[in-house]
Amino acid sequence: MMSHPDRADMPDTHFYAWDARGHGQSTGARGYSPSLARSVLDVDEFVRFVAKVAQVSLEDIVVIAQSVGAVLVSTWVHDYAPKIRGMVLASPAFKVKLYVPFARMGLKLMQRIRGLFYVNSYVKGKLLSHDPERIESFEQDKLITRAIAVNILLDLYKTAERIVSDSAAITLPTQLLISGDDFVVHVKPQKQFYAGLRSAIKEQHILPGFYHDTLGEKDRALAFDKMKNFIDKLYAAKPYVFDYSHEDQWSPSADAYRELQAPPKARSLEEMFYSSLSYGMKTVGRLSKGMCLGYETGFDSGSTLDYVYRNQPEGNGILGRMIDRHYLNSIGWRGIRIRKINIQQVIEQAVAKLKESDMPIRVIDIAAGHGRYVLDALEKHQDIESILLRDYSDLNVEKGQAMIEERGLGHVAQFKEGNAFDYDSLATIEPAPTLGIVSGLYELFPDNASIKASLAGLAAAIPPGGVLVYTGQPWHPQLKTIAYTLTSHQNDIPWMMRVRSQKEMDTLVEQADFEKCHQVIDEFGIFTVSLAVRKQHG
C-alpha cells in the first residue's frame, strides 16, 4: 500500500512507510527476528521516530497495517497502549492457514529437537491478489523472504491467540478490512477480535472477492475509499478518549475477577484437576523450598519474590530440587525474572534522565519487598543522594535492611515500614524523592481507589521533572491456576488478581499528573515496566 500513498487521495497527509520485507534490511538472517515481541518493539520505535521527525504528537498519527504487520500493530496497541489517533488493520494474520494436519504441533516438537530452523512458504502471488502487476512484483521481489524462522511463526500463533482473546483491552478507534476470499488466513479470528474491541468508534468491512493482499488487490480502490473515509472522520474530531473511571467495577476484567471468586463446579473435570493439583502441591510439593516458602509467607509476598529472583532450586533431596526447578520455571516466575531485568534497565534510564535535567537523585520504593532489584540497579552509582525503601512487612524490612548493610550501603540507603496506599505518609516523605518506584504492587489489588491514593501521594512528593517507574500486568495466562491453588500474603486467602489493561494503568498514572515516556514488556506479554515524568504544576 505504501508504494502508492497517492491512492489514498489524502494530499494533505504525510505518509511514512516501514519496509519490513524479510524483517527489514538490517544485518542478520533474512526472515528472522529474536522474537515477535522484538518486532512489536520495532513498531513502537518506528512510530515514535516518525512522531519526532514529523514534529507531531502521537495523537496526530494513524497507523495502517496489513497481514502479519496488522498482528504486530494490534499487539503493540494492546501491550503498549500508545496514544495514537487510530489504526486500520487489513486482513490481520491472526491465524495462518496451515494445510498440513498437526503442522503446528509438529513445528513445536521439531523446534525442541532442532532449535532454530526455517519454514518455507509456498504461497503464490496469484493467491494473494488479482492484480497482474502486484503478482509479478511479489514473484520477482528478492527482498520478500519465502522462509520464516520457526520461532517467529510459532510466536505469531501464540501472540495472535492472546490478542484475539483479550481484544476487549483495546479501546482505540479501529477499522478492520477483511478479504472475502482469503486463502492465507482464517476470517473467524478477525471477526472475534473485532467483536471484543471496546472503542465506540470501530468499523468492520468485508470485501467480497478480495484475496489476502487487501491493499494490493485489483479493486483496492474500494478498500482505500473506506480507509480514507474512516481516517478523515478521525482527524475531523477530537482524539477519542475512553472512559476508565469505572473499569475496576464494570469491565471485562472486573467480570473475569468476579468469576474467579466462584470455585469450579463440584465434581466437574475442572474442579477435579485443580483439587488434585492443589493437593499435590500441599503434600509432595512441600519438598520444594519455594513452595514451602509460598505457603508460609504467601506466594505474592516479598520473600517469595526474592526467592524467585535468586532462581536457585532448593528442596529436600533430588525430588525436592526437581520440583523446585519446575516451580521456578513456570511462565509466571520466568516473566517475573525478566521484569526484574527490565526494572533495573528502566531505573538506569530514570537516573540518566534526572542527570540530564541536573536534578538530584533521591529514590523512594514504596513497596520494595526485600529491595534486591533496587539495590542491584543503584549500588554502582556514586551520586545517589538517598535511597528510601519501604514495605508493609516487618520481615521484609528486616531482610531488606540486612541486605543494605551487607552491601555497605548504609550511608545512603535505609529501609522503613510504611503503607504504600497512605496518601499522607507518601506526600510528606523527606527528603522529597525525585525517582519513585512502584513494582509488582498495584497488580495485587483489584480496586482503583487505593491505587489513585497511592499515585496521588507520590505525585505530591515528587517535584515536576521527577520520574516514576511503575509496573503493570495487562494479561496473565495462569489466573485460574493461581486463584485455585496458591495463597496470598493477605491472611492466607486465595491469590486472585484482576488484570489491568496497559491503557487503564497508564490512565491512572496520567490522572496523577505523570506523563509516560517509555515502556518495555516481556516476551510473554505478561509484565510491563514503564517510565513517566512528573508534569509541571498547573
Regions found by a protein language model. Name each.
Residues 6-28:
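Conserved alpha/beta-hydrolase
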Residues 24-54:
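Catalytic nucleophile-loop/oxyanion-hole region of alpha/beta-hydrolase
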Residues 170, 176-178:
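Short beta-strand/loop motif that positions the catalytic acidic residue
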Residues 172, 186-195:
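Short alpha-helix in the alpha/beta-hydrolase fold that links the catalytic acid
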Residues 208-257:
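Catalytic active-site module of serine/aspartate enzymes centered on a nucleophile-bearing elbow/loop
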Residues 370-383:
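Conserved SAM-binding loop of SAM-dependent methyltransferases across substrates and taxa
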Residues 452-464:
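A short glycine-rich, Lys/Arg-flanked "PGG" loop and its adjoining helix->strand segment in the class I
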Residues 465-472:
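Conserved beta-strand signature within the Rossmann-like core of class I S-adenosyl-L-methionine
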